[in-house]
């Protein structure tokens, strides 16, 4: 039987499958056509994410059904070098108390004309 897989870019892929095919087999066929690794694929049908190890017939997927393909988002811990870089560019700043302009740590006066280049500066508050 033929099913369709719609990607986020709007393209539709036609796949030739059997009702007894597992979700892993479908993901492997998508990898053959699109080059997306199976571990990054998430298949959605009838507002449900399809679990690996189950078959198409388990989800009542019939001929000419459309599955939706979305990519898995990977999260994790930031590397220490990226944290240091974020601190340098976002946290280690001074702020003008009058116009709230962000300034470098070594600044003594504000760079904005709106507050008259005042010297009333404070360190930017840390995130909690």
Curated annotation (Swiss-Prot):
Origin species: Leishmania tarentolae (Sauroleishmania tarentolae)
An MF annotation (GO) of this entry: structural constituent of ribosome
Name recorded for this polypeptide: Ubiquitin-ribosomal protein eL40 fusion protein
Source species taxonomy: Eukaryota, Discoba, Euglenozoa, Kinetoplastea, Metakinetoplastina
PROSITE patterns xrefs: UBIQUITIN_2
Keywords associated with the record: Cytoplasm, Isopeptide bond, Nucleus, Ribonucleoprotein, Ribosomal protein, Ubl conjugation
Numbered residues of crosslink Glycyl lysine isopeptide (Lys-Gly) (interchain with G-Cter in ubiquitin): 48
Biological-process GO terms, alphabetical: translation
Residue stretches making up the Ubiquitin-like domain: 1-76
């Amino acid at each position: 039987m033929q099913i369709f897989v719609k990607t986020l870019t709007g393209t539709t892929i036609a796949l030739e499958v059997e009702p007894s095919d597992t979700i892993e087999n479908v993901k492997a066929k998508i990898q053959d056509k699109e080059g997306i690794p199976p571990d990054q694929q998430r298949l959605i049908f009838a507002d449900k994410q399809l679990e690996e190890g189950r078959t198409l017939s388990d989800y009542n997927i019939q001929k000419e059904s459309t599955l939706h393909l979305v990519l898995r988002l990977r999260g994790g811990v930031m590397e220490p070098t990226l944290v240091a870089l974020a601190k340098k560019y976002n946290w280690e700043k001074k702020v003008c108390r009058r116009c709230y302009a962000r300034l470098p740590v070594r600044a003594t006066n504000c760079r904005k004309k709106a507050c008259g280049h005042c010297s009333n500066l404070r360190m930017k508050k840390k995130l909690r």
